Each structure stands twice: as C-alpha cells, then as structure tokens.
C-alpha cells in the first residue's frame, strides 16, 4: 500500500508540475517495436495517459553488501505476470527503481555490467510491451546508508562523482534511445546529504548539477531521447524543499528536439 501511495503521489505531482511548466531474448523485438512511432504528448496528454502509477519497489534497487540483488529484500524476482496484474487493477504506469552500485566498473570507464542492463531492459519490456508507461531511475546509488553508495551530494570528490554519473546515464540512455514515449527516465531518488532538516546550499547545488548533467546527457544520446519526458527531484524528493526557496533550480533543456513546439516543456518534477 505504501508503494502505491508513493507512486500515486509521484504521478499527481507530475500533473501539477507539468501544468505549471509553460534479456537479450526480448531486446530485439522491443527495440524494433519501440523505434516505430514516438508520440509527442504535451503535459496534459502525458498526465492523462500515465494515469495512476504503481511502484515496483524493493526489487531492482535491492542490494546486499553493495551489490544489486533483486531478491535481497525478500521479494521474488519480478515477472511479467506482476505487471499484468497491476494493469488489470487499473494502473497505467510502473516505476522501476534501479540500483547500480558494484555493477559499475570504476576501473573500466564506469562501464555498467551488461547483464544487469539486460535485466533492467527485460523488466522495462514487461511494461512497454503491454502498453504501460515505465519510469526507470538511479536509486540506491545516492543513499548514504547503502553500502557502495557513491552519488553523494555532500562528498568533497564531486569531479569524480559527476564524471561517473554522466558515464552511467550515457549508457542507460543509449540502451533505451529507440524506445517510444512509454519510457521515462528519472535522474535519481531522494538525493540529499543524509542530514534531515534545512538543506545545505552547497549540497543542493550539487543536486542541481546532477540534474543538469542528466538532462544534457540523455538528450545528447540521440534516438528518441531528445524528445522524451524526463523526471527530476529536488532535495530528498521533498515538496517543501523543492517548491520553496531552499535552492532548487530547474535544469535548462538546451538539447530538446526541434520537434517539440516552442514553449512546451519535457521535464517533470518528482516530489
């Protein structure tokens, strides 16, 4: 129930913000299907199309000792039957939290393990192949409480963090660049410096920088990514610390496709 409430809150937030912003066996099949038509939906249309969402939590973001492990938190492996059950219950969107952690090779250009990306893609295909929206993010990598967490806005080594973050999103975005509008990328989840209370301006500036890197990097990978809806959070995905004067900055979208009508936006905010 908590996951459903969280997902519903995200979709409702998308509606408010968008309005205010004037396995290898399935890979080939989906890539071909995804590359056929991209429907450019404006903020009202995408909100209606996504409807109520369901969060597939404690699965692909689960980890043990710094290594992603889909069953580490006690859930069985995700199946297409689960996605279909959610669809039958009236959900139109599925959020898929994903942790990468040790699946990223720091000694090889921050390359993400291909078998892990295959599994992420397989779960995405469960959704889009059944005409549902899928939201894919970077999840536990930004937690100070998760072993191996590295996307840490309070860290002093921001140069390395930003390079790693950019490299990761280049790979994720490239993997999915031919998917249609049913796929949405979310930059990160509940990112903050681990200290509850008033946000640190310095750490918040790093979060803003991550969001800008995310938008620019995804757009530049080409395919359909230059017109795809993107989802970004503020401090700890907190509505007050995002909407009020605590330091949040909406990223610019300089590489948005010319196919998008002038004045229209393609960035959502998660709160």
For the regions a language model picked out, list residue spans one by one.
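Bacterial Sec-dependent N-terminal signal peptides
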Residues: 1-11
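Hydrophobic core
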Residues: 12, 16-20
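Sec-dependent signal peptide cleavage junction
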Residues: 20-35
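N-terminal carbohydrate-binding accessory modules
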Residues: 31-93
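Hydrophobic faces of well-ordered beta-strands that scaffold small-molecule active sites
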Residues: 52-56, 94-96, 134-136, 185, ...
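Solvent-exposed loop/turn segments at secondary-structure junctions
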Residues: 58-62, 93, 99-104, 140-144, ...
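An active-site-proximal structural segment forming one wall of the substrate-binding cleft
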Residues: 74-93, 109-140, 144-184, 206-219
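Extracellular glycoside hydrolase catalytic/binding regions
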Residues: 75, 167-170, 174, 179-182, ...
